[in-house]
């Protein structure tokens, strides 16, 4: 793959926000909290979006939700993903985020394929209903004022019920600053290959910037996607789990430089793991054991693709304190580098395809006026 010519990848503007390197950290519930975002921020400039929170929980003053919505001291761009199914709650939540947290950007999630969300008409099921999607997005944009709003969605329910072109048009007409397409259907979940040709279609269909999401496992994939699709930028989800340094290589590749951390040393991984836990302990007002147990899923991602052996993996998944993690990482062979076959190892969600659970008759009339029950607003990561 020919390197990018310096300056060939144009900056992207979202309102007053200028992204010189058009890379976005995908918001992931339970993952992209401030400790993880701050780690990523130390490796490269990008738009680091806070984890998904629900509008209803904010409006109803759920203390944990407000804790998860917090930003770090000096965080350069206060960006957050909001999920809501009721336009009134969405508008109230956006105003509260502006007033209390002085947010700079709101992203909205319409891509979650989890059955307990879609069977109630939420998540990836919402774009089927054009009026519902439009009313939710319009309420967010109106409440946000000068704060840019973006939305993320999938191709559709399945290959027979594609909604992404309509969703892009609705977002543009509502005043969104950009959209992100996860180039899979809800039925696909996270299986198979992302359909980058769908991103191309969306780019050609609307005038606002399109970010592509799906199958960026190494930095060169980002350049391939942009060249293949004409997308304005890329959004990174599973590809950065367990490797926050991924953003350093993305910035390098998109600015015409060679990446140097595609195959890091296990010593670097150990150091970053310990740094990550220290940041978690500083951020969360919980006992050390609870915080370290929260980290265990990250630990599995950090060593994905590494030949560390079953015993070290077992010990990692049982750690209950920073001292225990320090002892386990002390047994790492710090000098080995990630094997070539480990670069593209998939992390987190890998399931699918699976029939999408939907309310009865949901696909019959895309223009139907509909109001969703509160049960459609469940805080489940996905997009």
Model-based region annotation:
Residues 55-57, 113-114, 187-188, 219, ...:
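Short secondary-structure capping/turn micro-motifs that flank functional sites
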Residues 2-13, 28-104:
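Glycine-rich, positively charged N-terminal anion/phosphate-binding segment
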């Amino acid at each position: 793959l020919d390197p990018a010519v310096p300056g060939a990848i144009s900056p992207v503007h979202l309102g007053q926000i200028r992204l010189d390197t058009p890379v976005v950290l995908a918001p992931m519930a339970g993952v992209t909290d401030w400790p993880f975002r701050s780690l990523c921020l130390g490796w490269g400039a990008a738009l680091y979006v806070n984890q998904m929170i629900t509008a209803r929980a904010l409006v109803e003053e759920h203390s944990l939700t407000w804790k998860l919505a917090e930003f770090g001291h000096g965080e350069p761009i206060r960006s957050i993903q909001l999920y809501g199914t009721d336009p009134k709650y969405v508008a109230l939540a956006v105003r509260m985020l502006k007033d209390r947290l002085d947010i700079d950007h709101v992203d909205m999630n319409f891509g979650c394929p989890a059955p307990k969300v879609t069977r109630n008409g939420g998540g990836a099921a919402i774009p089927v209903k054009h009026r519902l999607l439009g009313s939710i997005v319009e309420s967010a944009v109106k409440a946000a004022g000068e704060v840019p709003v973006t939305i993320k969605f999938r191709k559709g329910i399945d290959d027979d019920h594609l909604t992404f072109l309509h969703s892009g048009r609705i977002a543009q007409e509502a005043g969104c600053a950009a959209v992100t397409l996860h180039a899979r259907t809800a039925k696909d979940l996270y299986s198979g290959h992302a359909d980058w040709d769908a991103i191309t279609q969306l780019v050609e269909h609307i005038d606002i910037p399109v970010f592509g999401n799906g199958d960026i496992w190494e930095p060169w994939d980002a350049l391939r996607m942009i060249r293949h699709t004409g997308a304005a930028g890329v959004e990174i989800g599973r590809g950065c789990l367990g490797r926050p340094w991924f953003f350093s290589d993305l910035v390098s590749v998109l600015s015409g430089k060679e990446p140097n951390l595609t195959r890091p040393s296990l010593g670097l991984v150990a150091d970053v793991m310990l740094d990550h836990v220290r940041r978690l302990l500083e951020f969360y007002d919980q006992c050390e054991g609870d915080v370290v147990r929260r980290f265990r899923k990250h630990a599995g991602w950090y060593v994905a693709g590494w030949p560390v052996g079953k015993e070290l993996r077992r010990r990692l998944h049982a750690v209950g304190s920073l001292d225990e993690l320090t002892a386990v990482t002390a047994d790492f062979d710090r000098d080995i580098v990630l094997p070539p076959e480990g670069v593209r190892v998939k992390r987190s969600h890998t399931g699918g395809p699976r029939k999408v659970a939907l309310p009865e008759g949901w696909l019959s009339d895309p223009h139907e006026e509909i109001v969703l029950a509160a049960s459609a607003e469940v805080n489940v990561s996905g997009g």
